[in-house]
A protein has these predicted regions:
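Small/aliphatic-rich secondary-structure junction motif
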Residues: 3-55, 79-88
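Histidine-centered beta-alpha loop that forms part of the nucleotide-sugar donor binding/catalytic region
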Residues: 10, 94, 117-120
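Short, well-ordered secondary-structure micro-motifs
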Residues: 18, 45-48, 99-102, 125-126
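Gly/Ser-rich helix-loop-strand patches that form or flank binding pockets
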Residues: 24, 106-147
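Structural motif
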Residues: 36, 90-92, 146
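A short acidic, glycine-rich active-site loop
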Residues: 55-71
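Structural beta-alpha unit
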Residues: 75-113
């Protein structure tokens, strides 16, 4: 059925359910799993009143974000290994979440994308919801959205 399944995670509870579902699907299909999280770049403000940080401070913050992202995909790997599913882990640094998901699926030759319908609350939910919509409308491979 599927050979390689990409699952996008942001660490939210619904996202964790999507990971579990993707792992089960990979196990049933004897497919490889690609666990992906997208980490934003530190925003640089060019507007008056914006707080400028030293490049070393920005690098430190981004490194922390990458560590957090790595922890998320490491958890995917741990869960997949328990089920005997081979997983490849990807932490992508991008401000364009949907594009990063689509690009990772293409790069790793995935034939299915699994993601949660939402995970965050408030403004982040609104923004990430639009990311999900972008993946749904721009992906050339099937997308499974879990609620």
């Amino acid at each position: 059925m599927f050979k390689r399944i990409l699952v996008a995670t942001d660490g939210s509870s619904l996202s964790k359910k999507a990971v579990g579902y993707a792992i089960s699907l990979a196990e049933q299909s004897d497919a490889e799993l690609v666990g992906l999280t997208v980490v934003a770049r530190y925003p640089t403000s060019y507007f008056e009143g914006g707080i400028a940080l030293a490049p070393s401070e920005v690098a430190r913050i981004e490194a922390q974000w990458m560590e957090s992202g790595q922890s998320l995909v490491d958890a995917v790997n741990t869960q997949a290994a328990r089920k005997g599913v081979k997983a490849k882990l990807v932490v992508s640094k991008s401000d364009l979440i949907a594009e990063a998901i689509i690009a990772a699926a293409k790069k790793h030759k995935c034939d299915l994308i699994v993601m949660a319908s939402h995970g965050r609350k408030g403004l982040k939910r609104l923004l990430l919801g639009s990311e999900k919509q972008h993946v749904l409308t721009h992906s050339t491979i099937p997308v499974l959205v879990l609620r």
